[in-house]
């Protein structure tokens, strides 16, 4: 195999994000549901026989040593001498959005190079490599929507009803470290239980699926959102812009993107014109990652 093209790296939304405590080492304890959506970056990998790693930015210019190159370098330690790769990245998922774009790119890179180089490393080993790159990388490697706990290391797959969403990303970004270090961050939300999320098979087969879907997508809140709104008023602007169209929005991750579930109906809904510089997209959620099963 000399190349693999058109490899998707899907973004995620946090349906809720609770901070339930803080460890002595400073890491925050969280609970969240990570949901894959069809807003994707695209990677292309080509085999190099000189042992070199190179990257080509096909859309947005990326930092010289981004997560993709770091992922490739970490995996290359398991490759045969002389195995290298040229990696092309077409970015579509915005940065500083709370959508996991960089982590998803790293996960897709690991899955792709594991196959390109014929390494056949198991998913558990890839996850060990991935967690050193970022806490969200193992989720994307796992390939399923998930209930996430601890500092992000406890991942349990969950089923989520199919739904459509509108995601709005204002041009301003947010520094995750600033949010987590804020003195007014809520760090004591009571621990929830997965059954309270109501995303089990019995709920999915309920007579009124819209009712059960509402429970799933309206569960909990995002503890990071009040701090983010204080630091970045554009988050509030985005929530209010969606609210003016009858959509109940909340922030994903540490922002600055916000999202809202769309009512059942046509594939594409008519939305008001977004302010200049905003990225707005209507998305569907995914049951599994497009590369699910590439490592087991």
From Swiss-Prot:
GO molecular function list: 4-(cytidine 5'-diphospho)-2-C-methyl-D-erythritol kinase activity; ATP binding
UniProt keyword list: ATP-binding, Isoprene biosynthesis, Kinase, Nucleotide-binding, Transferase
Annotated metabolic or biological route of this protein: Isoprenoid biosynthesis; isopentenyl diphosphate biosynthesis via DXP pathway; isopentenyl diphosphate from 1-deoxy-D-xylulose 5-phosphate: step 3/6
Source organism superkingdom: Bacteria
Active site as annotated: 12, 136
Binding locations of ATP: 94-104
Gene3D superfamilies noted in UniProt: 3.30.230.10, GHMP kinase, C-terminal domain
GO biological process, one term: isopentenyl diphosphate biosynthetic process, methylerythritol 4-phosphate pathway
Annotated catalysed reactions: 4-CDP-2-C-methyl-D-erythritol + ATP = 4-CDP-2-C-methyl-D-erythritol 2-phosphate + ADP + H(+)
Enzyme Commission number, as recorded: 2.7.1.148
EC class: transferase
Pfam families in UniProt: GHMP_kinases_C, GHMP_kinases_N
NCBIfam families, sorted: ispE
HAMAP family for the chain: IspE
Protein family: Belongs to the GHMP kinase family. IspE subfamily.
Main function: Catalyzes the phosphorylation of the position 2 hydroxy group of 4-diphosphocytidyl-2C-methyl-D-erythritol.
Protein name according to UniProt: 4-diphosphocytidyl-2-C-methyl-D-erythritol kinase
Organism name: Variovorax paradoxus (strain S110)
Lineage, uppermost ranks: Bacteria, Pseudomonadati, Pseudomonadota, Betaproteobacteria, Burkholderiales
Gene: ispE
């Amino acid at each position: 195999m000399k190349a693999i093209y058109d490899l998707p790296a899907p973004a995620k939304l946090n349906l809720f994000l609770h901070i339930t405590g803080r460890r002595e080492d400073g890491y925050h304890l969280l609970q969240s549901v990570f949901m894959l959506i069809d807003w994707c970056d695209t990677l292309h990998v080509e085999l190099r026989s000189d042992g070199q790693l190179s990257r080509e930015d096909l859309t947005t210019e990326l930092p010289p040593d981004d997560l993709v190159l770091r992922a490739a370098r970490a995996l290359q330690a398991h490759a045969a001498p002389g195995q290298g790769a040229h990696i092309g990245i077409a970015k579509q998922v915005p940065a500083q959005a709370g959508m996991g774009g960089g982590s998803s790119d790293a996960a897709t890179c690991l899955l792709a190079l594991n196959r390109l180089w014929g390494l056949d490393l198991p998913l558990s080993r890839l996850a060990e490599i991935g967690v050193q790159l970022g806490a969200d990388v193992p989720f994307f490697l796992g390939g399923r929507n998930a209930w996430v706990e601890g500092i992000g290391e406890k991942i349990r797959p969950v089923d989520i009803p199919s739904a459509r969403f509108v995601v709005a990303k204002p041009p301003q970004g947010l520094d995750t470290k600033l949010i987590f270090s804020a003195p007014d961050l809520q760090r004591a939300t009571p621990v929830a239980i997965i059954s309270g999320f109501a995303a089990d098979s019995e709920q999915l087969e309920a007579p009124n699926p819209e009712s059960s879907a509402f429970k799933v997508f309206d569960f909990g809140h995002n503890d990071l959102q009040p701090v983010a709104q204080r630091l970045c008023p554009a988050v509030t602007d985005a929530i209010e812009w969606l609210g003016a169209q009858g959509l109940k929005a909340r922030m994903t991750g540490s922002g600055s993107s916000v999202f809202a579930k769309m009512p059942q109906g046509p594939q594409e809904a008519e939305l008001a014109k977004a302010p200049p510089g905003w990225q707005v997209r209507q998305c569907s959620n995914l049951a599994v990652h497009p590369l699910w099963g590439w490592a087991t």
